[in-house]
Amino acid sequence: NVNKKAGKAIKQNLMRILFGRLHYNAESAGIGWVTVQRNEEKIKEVLTAAHTNDATVPDLQNHISNDVFIQIVNSVIRLIGNAYRYEGNPYDDEIFPRDTDAEFRNLKSKDPIRLYIYACCDKFGIPYERRNGRQTKMPNVLGQAVLDYLKAVGNKQMFLKPHTLKVRCVSLEEKGLICPNCGRVHLNLSAGICSGCFRRLDDNHTIQVEKLRSNTDLMINVVKGRPVCRLHSEELSGQTDNQGERQLEFRDIVRIKSQDSN
């Protein structure tokens, strides 16, 4: 029980840093971007699967490269994280994986992931059908390929498992793209589409990673070159008769059953 409680708190804090709002996330702070294992065989499989099963469906390999596909996957990961769809999220009684989440068609018409995928399809000339209305469930070959790839690397039902994620860190000399419309920072190229407002990104609006890091307190110790320091904490809990037991139970690191004489 203690391990579960401590593990959940660690995951929550880690994911909060990776997918936080405004300047408090990995990309906006100049740390890097969240990605998953790259498997070329799996990429080819998901890009061609729909066309192989139905020749009338577009062959995605004729429209996007593997590099662009991974950029799209990375941005969808960011959007999933922004929606708290990850293991150990603070709203796990409301946000959890469902069987219907495995299908792109079940996304709401205004879901950010759906809108981002549509913008990518428009840019790369991938045909798709789009309708308005809450009752209309529209599939999308690119969107489904992204979800299928995430499932293949351990993140099924559009729900992230922290142990499957990787962070591609950036150096001070690298640059990020800034959306000219909403100002969102992208260290991942995002296939040239903003994952915030779904407008086009361009090379005329960039920012140095060094400047990003100086603008947020998440990286203040790195920017100032401060050495690693030891964290010291004091007990602030109330006093009890049994000092030894109290010390062991402090911060729930070890739990002692009151009836256990040992």
Residue ranges and their predicted role:
Residues 1-259:
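Helicase motor interdomain insertion/brace
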